[in-house]
A protein has these predicted regions:
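Extracytoplasmic low-complexity, Pro/Thr/Ser/Ala/Gly-rich segments
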Residues: 16-40, 130
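Leucine-rich solenoid repeat scaffolds
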Residues: 107-140
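Glycine-centered beta-turn/loop sites at beta-strand termini
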Residues: 26-30, 36, 45, 54, ...
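C-terminal region of N-terminal signal peptides and the immediate post-cleavage residues
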Residues: 4-22
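Alpha-helical transmembrane bundles and membrane-interface segments of multipass inner-membrane proteins
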Residues: 16-20, 29, 60, 78, ...
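Glycine/tyrosine- and acidic-biased, solvent-exposed loop/turn segments at the edges of beta-strands
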Residues: 85, 95, 135-139
Length: 140
């Protein structure tokens, strides 16, 4: 499902690939709290410092601008924080997590094989031995 996405390239062209997904749940230009459904969701926070919980299902979470908090929930999810100092947690499943620009914090010690990319900025990650990590400078 996520194979067609250029998940971890550090270029604006590839980061835009995340935004080409059709949003099924959309926030506003301000801070939002958004929850996914039990199925597959594409949740777009847009502007503001958003809190997004994907819930069950294989979801795509896009924080957008702001200091966002993204939680994938159950399922194999794709999380993209966007510009800002974001906090991202994949939760259960083989997740792909991209922090984007800013000083991001990523949690992925769930026993699944996750792919983590902090993006530009000084990023911090907690991971387990199954995870593949790029562009992260600090580990917990």
């Amino acid at each position: 499902m996520f194979a067609s996405l250029a998940l971890f390239a550090a270029t604006k062209a590839h980061a835009a690939t995340y935004h080409s997904q059709a949003c099924t749940i959309t926030g506003t230009s301000g801070p939002d709290i958004l929850f996914g459904t039990p199925g597959r969701d594409v949740i777009c926070g847009l502007g503001g410092s958003d809190r997004i919980d994907g819930g069950r299902g294989n979801d795509v979470l896009i924080g957008g601008a702001g200091a966002d908090l993204l939680g994938g929930g159950e399922g194999s999810d794709l999380l993209y924080g966007g510009p800002g100092n974001d906090k991202l947690q994949g939760d259960g499943g083989n997740d792909a997590v991209y922090g984007g620009a800013g000083q991001d914090t990523i949690w992925a010690w769930d026993g699944y094989a996750d792919r983590l990319n902090g993006g530009s900025g000084v990023d911090h990650a907690w991971k387990d031995k199954l995870d593949r990590v790029t562009e992260v400078e600090r580990f917990g």
